[in-house]
Amino acid sequence: MADRDRAGQYYQQQRGQVGETVKGILPEKAPSASQALTVATLFPLGGLLLVLSGLALAASVVGLAVATPVFLIFSPVLVPAALLIGLAVAGFLTSGALGLGGLSSLTFLANTARQAFQRTPDYVEQARRRMAEAAAHAGHKTAQAGHAIQGRADQAGTGAGAGGGAGTKTSS
């Protein structure tokens, strides 16, 4: 009965050590909710701004190509020409602003990802070291259990051999 109690205590102790080992392997600091929300917001926003930048640039070029001959042929007055130039400049500035916003958003996202990946090797090395320690500990405990079983087998063998040899046969 005492052996069972010791085995139960041993199991509970080993189970606690394994739990601590697993906790040690997992990263202690995960991305916060605000960081995850930032990434989830900025990535689509950056892509959308880049798409809008491209559309604004394309619309400016097409509008300039279509409106220039119309204004020159039908109304050679300075007001429509100034309007045309103003709209073209506004289109190019809008395109540049949207492109700059998209690029800055994606740059921030790339820097955040780079910083996260630079921290990862520390966690990997720490996990590798803890796994090696756990494997060495398991090997040590296995060797102890093997020695204990060997000792019990030796005791059982010497106890049976000391019984007087009632079942042995001698030849004359």
From Swiss-Prot:
One of its GO terms (biological process) is lipid storage. The keyword Repeat applies. It is a multi-pass membrane protein. Pfam families: Oleosin. InterPro entries: Oleosin. It is found in: Lipid droplet; Membrane. The modification N-acetylalanine is found at residue 2. PROSITE patterns: OLEOSINS. Residues 39-110 are annotated as: Hydrophobic. Residues 147-172 are annotated as: Disordered. The chain crosses the membrane at residues 42-62, 70-90, 91-111. GO terms for cellular component: membrane; monolayer-surrounded lipid storage body. Belongs to the oleosin family. May have a structural role to stabilize the lipid body during desiccation of the seed by preventing coalescence of the oil. Probably interacts with both lipid and phospholipid moieties of lipid bodies. May also provide recognition signals for specific lipase anchorage in lipolysis during seedling growth. PANTHER family: OLEOSIN, OLEOSIN 20.3 KDA. This is Oleosin 18 kDa. It comes from Oryza sativa subsp. indica (Rice).
